Amino acid sequence: MTEARYESAQKELEDIAKDIYQQMNKGKIPSMTIPVRTKGNIKFSRKNSVWKLGKSMGQRSAKKLNGAYMLLRTLHMMEFIEDMIDQKKSSTLREMYYISEGWEHAKFSTQNESNKLAEDLEAITGCMREDFKLRPEEDGARVIGDITIEEVNRKGEKKKINCRDDVGDSGYGIPYNVEKDKLKIKSVGVDFIIAIETGGMFDRLVENGFDETSNSLLVHLKGQPARSTRRFIKRLNEEHDVPLAVFTDGDPWSFRIFASLAFGAIKTAYISEYLATPTAEYVGITASDILNYELPTDKLSDQDASALRAELSDPRFKGQFWKNEIELMLQINKKAEQQALAKYGLDFVTDKYLPDKLGELGLM
């Protein structure tokens, strides 16, 4: 299965190169057709509850100098990817940016430019960057709980790991590639997943043994979650019907972490169905919690208030719950961290707060 994925990716890239060659062979100015990935071509699919690319297409042509440079960079990148697949190597996105220093006129001016080109190739081919042997700098999440996975290590050996019994307090680190050829989910002994924004709160729940008392899988998101984290959660939800609850701070940016997990992000709209878990439930801090528990707070910044107002028209936050909580947060002009619950002691979050919220959802 692994080789088939990589062979398919190579064929897709070779088809692009052949098309450019054939255009040049006929004396035409070469061009590529690519999906438009601007905000105007991204729609929220109410049917699937995820962000999706629209049908608008654009052209990258050598007619202008900048377009010619981008086509040259594209060809260099495709060659680099093919070489990695042949050599059974992989590269970080950062390494690929520096590799381009040897491409003379085709070198990238910024890493953002090289990252976007890799995303364009994903959108054009329907392949994933994992199929291209490209990986991000950041690690995936830490997880702890009663699930058993089988991971293929760098030597090609299969290793079975129980993510509760075979790991230390820091948990199991999710690799950048969590597809079935790399990672198999062998057994699931948890009732639900709880995705936690901050490391401090993840450690609190681990120390309090919440994974065992609630029979859950704890996942540390590390802020905005990495793609591998979202994909890992999606696989558990889709393949094993494990519900997802998201526990974050109470501010507009944390609300967007929930939205990214549940409905996808605009930037990766072309793969939202592959990453998003639309059935996710929110159990994070709300404006109502701030008032009901009299939590320590900070004042909203102008940026916070602007982001909250934008969320009122964001289709990911439709429904009375989000409308009420966002409007209330704007009204009280306050935000709070999830660790503010420590006001009531170190056990309050696991003895009272989460059991109450999860109980309302029928998860505990």
Predicted segments — roles?
Residues 1-243, 252-364:
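Nucleic-acid enzyme cleavage-core boundary/entry regions
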